[in-house]
């Protein structure tokens, strides 16, 4: 199994495209991470919108550059709104990304996410346990936390990618991005990133935005993982703990965009 690495030139090119196109991202995400997710997108140069009412969600999915479905705080009314948005995104050819939070531990959201797969997401982003559960390989995870190493989920990610046509991202100490054939590994980051709620969910929003960019979508999505890890490393170097990490992280994302514009 060959795992390719992303070059710094590829990452910089994708970030230039990101800043140039400034995708409008319709984030149907969980209540815990909305502010952090929106600020992450803004720091990188995208435009976030958090539209959740069913009628509006369907309408906005046709306007947005990309749609994110994150099931972290799933309810039945929210599931109805998400389904409506995904159906409209499919009709409008709006790329959409699924973040199947905790599907390995909870049956209702697993069934819901499996139903959504019939609408062919452009990308799927989850930890190893979530990706393996969604692929039907195993049930597991400790709520939103993974109990599996990312590398162990590569075969499941490849299978899921081939079956759905999505680019699948497995995040962990090393992130792996695959279209079912090619695999790109992204190293970096810091364990402190797991002590701040929302870094994975925010990455899913950035992945969604990258699905709207021209060029090689696999490389663009892998670049999203690289930006987040790179910003995390910079933020940790300036932080004293989780509380001071978040503002430094947002600053680091902003600085990355300024560097590619220089």
UniProtKB/Swiss-Prot annotation:
Annotated Pfam families: HK (PF02110)
Biological process, per Gene Ontology: thiamine biosynthetic process; thiamine diphosphate biosynthetic process
Binding site for substrate: 50, 198
Keywords: ATP-binding, Kinase, Magnesium, Metal-binding, Nucleotide-binding, Thiamine biosynthesis, Transferase
Top-level taxon of the source organism: Bacteria
Cofactor (UniProt): Mg(2+)
Catalytic activity: 5-(2-hydroxyethyl)-4-methylthiazole + ATP = 4-methyl-5-(2-phosphooxyethyl)-thiazole + ADP + H(+)
Keyword Kinase: yes
Pathway: Cofactor biosynthesis; thiamine diphosphate biosynthesis; 4-methyl-5-(2-phosphoethyl)-thiazole from 5-(2-hydroxyethyl)-4-methylthiazole: step 1/1
Binding site for ATP: 125, 171
EC number: 2.7.1.50
GO molecular function: ATP binding; hydroxyethylthiazole kinase activity; magnesium ion binding
Main function: Catalyzes the phosphorylation of the hydroxyl group of 4-methyl-5-beta-hydroxyethylthiazole (THZ).
Family: Belongs to the Thz kinase family.
Protein name: Hydroxyethylthiazole kinase
